[in-house]
């Protein structure tokens, strides 16, 4: 499989290493901001890389969005987070002519976490819910795309909920329809997501802790391996 990388930061550098270990070839890179040197051919536009079978994106909206407006038919694996609603709209339009895979978190374990959450929320309707994520001190967006995804799952299963991002200005008790959303940044934390269900005299916590960023890179490579055999459409872990 020949791979074009969109972005050449820490994540796609891992993708390159792990993909080559699996026998795949990196045939080019699109990156206008990275200070890292690359041994691969560099391109400005997706359509310029004729050898690629698929593109894997770990970048940012500033780099990705203009590329999505171009004319090409290359399958895309998208891991960019931020500006989610706009991103999804663009990807759904693009998926009418080419296969597109998107996940806010490329870990299959996080996908399993969302499935567990779908089961837990209806069972624990009387419990308050708080969501917490923790990442390294270089992550610039907050809350994480994964935490937003977890909130979206809850919103579909519990009526009239609303997110609460900051409590220090509130001088009133918590309401049941609040979903607390908290972000922690520090050190080299790869990624941690905790769902707290707090009831009367008991709590339940569901957690996922990433121990290496390799899980995200391997998830993207695995998605690409399947996506290149798919018809045009919008794919997630649910239908890939």
Curated annotation (Swiss-Prot):
One Gene Ontology molecular-function label: oxidoreductase activity, acting on CH or CH2 groups, NAD or NADP as acceptor
Protein's UniProt keywords contain Cytoplasm: yes
Organism this protein belongs to: Staphylococcus epidermidis (strain ATCC 12228 / FDA PCI 1200)
Lineage start: Bacteria, Bacillati, Bacillota, Bacilli, Bacillales
Protein name listed in UniProt: 4-hydroxy-tetrahydrodipicolinate reductase
Gene this protein is translated from: dapB
Biological function: Catalyzes the conversion of 4-hydroxy-tetrahydrodipicolinate (HTPA) to tetrahydrodipicolinate.
Active site (record annotation): 135 (proton donor/acceptor), 139 (proton donor)
EC code(s) of this entry: 1.17.1.8
Involved pathway(s): Amino-acid biosynthesis; L-lysine biosynthesis via DAP pathway; (S)-tetrahydrodipicolinate from L-aspartate: step 4/4
Family the entry assigns: Belongs to the DapB family.
Reactions mediated catalytically: (S)-2,3,4,5-tetrahydrodipicolinate + NAD(+) + H2O = (2S,4S)-4-hydroxy-2,3,4,5-tetrahydrodipicolinate + NADH + H(+); (S)-2,3,4,5-tetrahydrodipicolinate + NADP(+) + H2O = (2S,4S)-4-hydroxy-2,3,4,5-tetrahydrodipicolinate + NADPH + H(+)
Keywords: Amino-acid biosynthesis, Cytoplasm, Diaminopimelate biosynthesis, Lysine biosynthesis, NAD, NADP, Oxidoreductase
HAMAP family with a match to the protein in the record: DapB (MF_00102)
GO biological process annotation, one example: diaminopimelate biosynthetic process
């Amino acid at each position: 499989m020949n791979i074009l990388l969109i972005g050449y930061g820490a994540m796609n550098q891992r993708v390159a290493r792990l993909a080559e270990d699996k026998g795949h070839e990196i045939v080019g890179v699109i990156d206008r901001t990275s200070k890292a040197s690359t041994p691969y051919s560099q391109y400005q536009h997706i359509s310029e890389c004729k050898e690629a079978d698929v593109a894997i994106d770990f970048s940012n909206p500033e780099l990705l969005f203009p590329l999505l407006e171009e004319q090409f038919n290359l399958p895309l694996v998208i891991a960019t987070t931020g500006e989610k609603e706009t991103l999804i709209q663009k990807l759904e339009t693009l998926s009418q002519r080419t296969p597109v895979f998107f996940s806010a978190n490329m870990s299959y374990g996080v996908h399993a976490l969302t499935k567990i959450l779908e089961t837990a929320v209806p069972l624990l309707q009387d419990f308050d819910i708080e969501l917490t994520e923790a990442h390294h001190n270089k992550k610039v967006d907050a809350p994480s795309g994964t935490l937003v995804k977890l909130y979206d799952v809850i919103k579909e299963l519990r009526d009239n909920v609303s997110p609460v991002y900051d409590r220090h200005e509130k001088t009133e008790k918590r309401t049941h329809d609040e979903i607390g959303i908290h972000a922690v940044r520090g050190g080299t934390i790869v990624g941690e997501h905790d769902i707290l269900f707090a009831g009367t005299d008991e709590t339940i916590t569901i957690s996922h802790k990433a121990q290496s960023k390799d899980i995200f890179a391997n998830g993207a490579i695995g998605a690409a391996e399947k996506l290149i055999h798919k018809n045009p459409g919008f794919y997630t872990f649910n239908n890939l």
